[in-house]
């Protein structure tokens, strides 16, 4: 709620460039994920200031992991989430948001693939693509695993697990979301540049 606009990994470059253009700025602060910010910076001329925060799932992947996966699984296609460190994207075959990774698998149907992202994402894409062999070097997100159907049910029916947000914070957060939603809709999720 302390930002002017929010973004997703699908539209981060679009948001950075739109903000810079609208405010005639050559520098944008992109937080909290330093790796998404660094990977966005590689795709734009806008100077990006970042913060040393990271997703605890994606920051665990390394370029060495990619090398080991290629050695253990010859011919495997490596797809990386843009919140992975830049050196991972440099050795991956493709990088993009979760939607872009899912589209890649659906459209190109590689024989064998690795998704360098949270395990549940790989599970969902695998379920939609039964003809593709998924290698799963899983990193689990403990926070996402707390969101269960039972907890959602309890929240909706019984009012349990409710998170109360002060109205002033809600309004600022809504303004940041509204600013993002006002941007033109992208036709497809963004592909991130990779080194391969």
Language model segments and positions:
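The feature marks the mature, well-folded catalytic cores of soluble enzymes
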Residues: 1-196
């Amino acid at each position: 709620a302390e930002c002017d606009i929010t973004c997703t990994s699908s539209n981060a470059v679009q948001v950075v460039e739109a903000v810079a253009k609208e405010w005639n700025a050559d520098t944008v602060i992109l937080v909290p994920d330093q790796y998404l910010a660094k990977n966005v910076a590689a795709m734009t001329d806008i100077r990006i200031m970042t913060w040393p925060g990271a997703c605890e799932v994606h920051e665990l992947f390394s370029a060495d992991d990619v090398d080991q996966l290629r050695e253990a699984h010859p011919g495997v296609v490596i797809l990386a989430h843009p919140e992975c460190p830049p050196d991972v994207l440099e050795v991956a075959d493709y990088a993009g948001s979760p939607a872009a990774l899912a589209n890649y698998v659906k459209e190109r149907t590689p024989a064998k693939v690795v998704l360098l992202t949270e395990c549940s994402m790989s599970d969902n894409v695998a379920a939609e693509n039964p003809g593709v062999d998924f290698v799963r070097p899983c990193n689990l997100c403990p926070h996402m695993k707390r969101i269960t159907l039972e907890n959602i049910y309890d929240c909706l029916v019984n009012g349990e697990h409710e998170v109360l947000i002060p109205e002033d914070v809600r309004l600022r957060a809504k303004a940041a979301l509204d600013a993002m939603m006002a941007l033109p809709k992208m036709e497809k999720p963004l592909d991130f540049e990779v080194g391969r």
